[in-house]
Amino acid sequence: MDKLKTVDVFMGTRPEAIKMAPVVAALKQHGGLRCRVVGTGQHREMFHQVAGELGFTVDVDLDTMQPNQTLAGLTARLMHKIDGWLEGSQPDIALVQGDTTTVFVAALACFYRRIPIGHVEAGLRTPSILAPFPEELNRRLASRIVSLHFAPTRSAQAALLREGVAEDTIEVTGNTVVDALFMELSRQAEPSIRASVEASLTTAIGPDWATRPFVLITGHRRESFGEGFEQICRAIRTLALRYPEYRFIYPVHLNPNVQRPVNRLLKGVANICLIPPQGYRNFVALMNRCKLILTDSGGVQEEAPSLGKPVLVMRETTERPEGIEAGTALLVGAAETAIVDNTIRLLDETPAYDAMANAVNPYGDGRAAERIVARIGRFFGLQ
C-alpha cells in the first residue's frame, strides 16, 4: 500500500456527533484509512459537549456559528470555510451524516473539487421538501451528489432506488445511532461513570430523579416554531397538571425560538423540570429511566425502541416510517389535543403501553459503523 487513504468526517451538530462517533472509532481501527474530524460549528457548544463524552476530538474547527444567523448566511459561511479547508487538505473521501446544512454544503463543495463523498443515513424522505424544513431539501440535494449512500434501512434504500440512484452505490447498514447507544450503555455499566451520571442528574433535577416516574420531552425543529411550539407547550402543561405524580423533564434547546415559548408557558409549573441541554451520557440515562418520550427528534425515534420506551412523535410527518410501522413510535402531530389524548392513553392503558414498549427496534443491530467502514475500504480496494 502506497499510503493511507484520508477520510475527512464533516459534522457540526450534536446529533451528527452522536451518530458519527461510532464511525470515527471504526475508521481509526482500519489499517488503511486515516480519519480527520472537521467540525463546522453549527451547534458549537452542544457539539463539543457530546464529542468529549463519546471519545473523539475535533481535528479542525471551521467555527462558522454566529448569533441569529440566517440559513442563507450559514450556507455562505459554510461554503467559504469548507471549500477553503478542502483546497489545502485534499482528502481522498469525505463523510457527512443526516440532513443538516453542513451535509448539503459539504457535499456540494466536495463535488466542485471532484472529491468523493459518502452520506451516512442516506435515503430518508418525507412527501414535502418543506417538512422538515430545511432538512428535507438538504438531504435530497445531497443524494444527487454523493458517491456512496449508506442507507440505514431497506425502506431508505428503496427511496434512493426510486430516485434513480445506482444500486451498487447503496449499502444498507443499519443506523449508527444504535451503535452509539450500545456503546454508551456499556460505558454506563462502569461504576465510576454511573456514579458521575447519577450525581450530575441529581444536581440538575433533584434527588428523586431516578425514583419518581417521569415523561421525557425534547423539541427543537424549525418546522414547529411559532404556533406549533405553542401547542406543544400547552399540551405539556395540561398533562403536567393532570398527572401530578409524574415529573415532566424537558432539556430545553438553546435556540431562542424554543426558549421563549417554553419559559413563558411552562416555567413555574411544579412538576415540570426545565433543564439545560444534556450531554449524550446524561440523555441516555434519562431515556433509560423514563416512562415514555414526547419528541420531534429523529435520533430519539431510533434509539428509544432499544430501551423499550414508547415514543410519541410531535410532528406532522416523519422520514422514519419504520418505527411507526413496527409500533415503536406513534405520529401524533403538534396539535395540543392529539398530544394530550395519546399520552393519556399510554399512561392510563397498560395494554396500549406494553404493545409499544415491547415492539422490536427496526433500526439496526449495533454494527452499522463496521459496515460503513468496510464499504469505504472496498471503495479504495482495501481489505
PLM region spans:
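Nucleotide-activated sugar donor-binding and catalytic core shared by glycosyltransferases
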Residues: M1-Y250, N255-Q383
